[in-house]
Amino acid sequence: RVDGSEQHTLSCYRGISCGLGSHVSSVAQHLLKEGTSPEHLYPYTGRDDPCNQKTPTPIDAVAWSYANEWPLIFNDPWHHSRFVAGIKAALCQHGPVTASMWVTPAFRAYSNGIFNENNGVFATNGALRHSQTNHAMALVGWGLDKSSRPWRTYWIVKNSWGTDWGESGF
């Protein structure tokens, strides 16, 4: 399991801040060029701390593909299942996958369990938010909710808001 340091990226990449965040593509370019430190060497503080240049950066990022969001938006079952299978394969073959979404107040308040918000994440008042995202996270795995009928797949995400959010940051 690879646990990269969000704080290293926050502190050592000039194009990012706690208050304003950054664009996923520019952070990805930084990670591709510079790499990052393991979480245990550069733990998350959630502050705009100065960069510790002496911390090693042995974790390299690899760009291998871009997954299109359209199958999720149009909810075509055939495309959706292929899209989900592709993400699962990418997780198994390459490790964490960057995912972005529209964060709602309910998501900010998430504390435990399987988060499910049908209204607001991808649609608001019937309008699709396919091109509007305001937060990126690392997809690190998936599970199967056997308490729902039919069973539903859920994603396991590592958020960058620290261990006080969700279930220790997940």
Write out the residue ranges for each language-model feature:
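Catalytic-core signature of thiol
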Residues: 1-170
